[in-house]
């Protein structure tokens, strides 16, 4: 306070002509990208109003930051929490045990987390939903949340207090859905806010409702100027539509459903397999804590499906394959399964898609 007392709170006008925000992407499949975004005057206020409506955050809550501040989603949650006068608790570690312990210790009311962390918490030995009794709002984002995991958490957090956001650091668009609305549209990530979403095929043509294609989004006239640092910008068409390579579909009511990243689609024997679909099935098994599915080169299949699995009790490959056959056709079943004590996650709590097997 003594140091700051001798300085004006006002910045000279030429120091920050246009407020700018820089965040890092998740970096789960490669080098993290630094993404810069201009924030013209007034835009931050409008963004905050949108945030309150889609995330469930209120003023003066006890808030836990379950992610690093250099990543977009935790940074936004922290910034907006400070704006709301929230008390912010910042964990030294982002493992499931630490998060649950701090929620109980500080009686946390608001928390935002990734589905990977939700899965690890629910698979903790001795976990009880009473451990999270203080939570008034939980908002999840930053990865695929299976329907089974979502329903599991809807038994822990009441539907009207569980929010889901689908967005990306590139700020091309955002959808959201609350738990009670999700129960009417299971599997959906919600509707687009302040803009439009289009699903297109490889030739750029829009596809019918219910058909999977590449997700394009546009804020219209409200699109922020977003650039990668030291990388080419995302292509944008005349209507402002851009894509980060996610795949999904829109139903007749305008609800968006996420399938997977285009780069995570495995072509095996001429068939397209989304890694996320196989991962979600494997994670249904009660002994599976986490699973990652990748495609490995194969002389017969082009690529074979390989799973890396973390378990909390002994289980064999044959048992998991038999289990998966209850939900998936044979061509989507892993041809090989690798067991590990711990699937690595990055600082954001998102799975890192790396394995010794990937070097084969």
Protein language model regions, located:
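Conserved ATP/PPi-binding loop(s) of AMP-dependent carboxylate-activating enzymes
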Residues: 191-192, 205-236, 255, 271-273
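Conserved beta-loop-beta connector loops within the AMP-binding
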Residues: 185, 198-218, 249-253, 313-317, ...
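Conserved small/polar residues in nucleotide/adenosyl-binding loops
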Residues: 25, 353-359
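Gly/Ser/Thr-rich phosphate-binding loop
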Residues: 23-26, 83, 109-110, 126-185, ...
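Conserved structural elements of the adenylate-forming
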Residues: 6, 13, 20, 34-58
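Flexible lysine-rich "adenylation lid" loop at the C-terminal edge of ANL adenylation domains
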Residues: 203-204, 328, 340-355
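AMP-binding/adenylate-forming catalytic core of the ANL superfamily
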Residues: 103, 111, 239, 245-333, ...
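Conserved AMP-binding/adenylation subdomain of ANL enzymes
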Residues: 43-63, 70-109, 124
